[in-house]
Each structure stands twice: as C-alpha cells, then as structure tokens.
C-alpha cells in the first residue's frame, strides 16, 4: 500500500505552527513530485511567522528552499527519473522584466 499522506509544518496564523498529516499532492501531467530531504527557512519565512507580510495568506507551509528526491513523475519533460536528487528553484518568473534581468526573479513584476 502506498503512502497517502505526508507530514507538514503548517503556519496556521502568525506565531502558530502545527505539525500535521496532509494529503500527498497529486502529480499533474508534465510535473514531478519531490520527496523533501532538507528544507531551509529564510527571511521571508520569518516575516510570515511573525505576520509581517501584507501579501501573505494563511494557512501555509513554510520553506521554499529545498532539496530532495523525485518520487513520482507524470510525463515530466527532460531527463528526470524517479530517484534523482534535485534542488528546487522556487520562483516562477517571466525572465524579461527589470527584476528578472537583474537576476531577482523573486521580485518578478509580471507575475
């Protein structure tokens, strides 16, 4: 029987973390799922924890700098295969706005 849930440290609201079982995410076509091995907390996570970000919604799972192992693939492009060790670039970006051209994809103005 395959695992159907995973552990997640959920920030329910400012200053309130809750370790809980959450459903294992489905893998949509063209994507791969990564089983986390290590996750880092950065300044934006601290701001979220303290409630200092106006753009933030709760609940949320902190930690967007991570590495892991691919555990499922659903037609993902490229040379990916189950068992590959990967790190994740956590930002979607347009690649052409001022912020993206300055390698500050986390500040992309087009998304």
Locations of regions flagged by a protein language model:
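Cytochrome P450 core scaffold surrounding the K-helix E-X-X-R motif
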Residues: 44-50
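Glycine-rich beta-strand-centered segment in the early N-terminal region that forms part
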Residues: 25-39, 52-101, 106
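Short N-terminal binding/cap micro-motifs at the start of the first secondary-structure element
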Residues: 15-19, 43-44
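Generic structural detector for well-ordered beta-strands
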Residues: 21-23
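Short structural boundary motif marking the start of a folded domain
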Residues: 2-9
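Short, surface-exposed acidic/glycine-rich loop or hinge patches that mediate macromolecular interfaces
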Residues: 13-16, 91
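Residue-level signal for short segments within beta-strands and strand-turn junctions
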Residues: 10-12, 50, 101
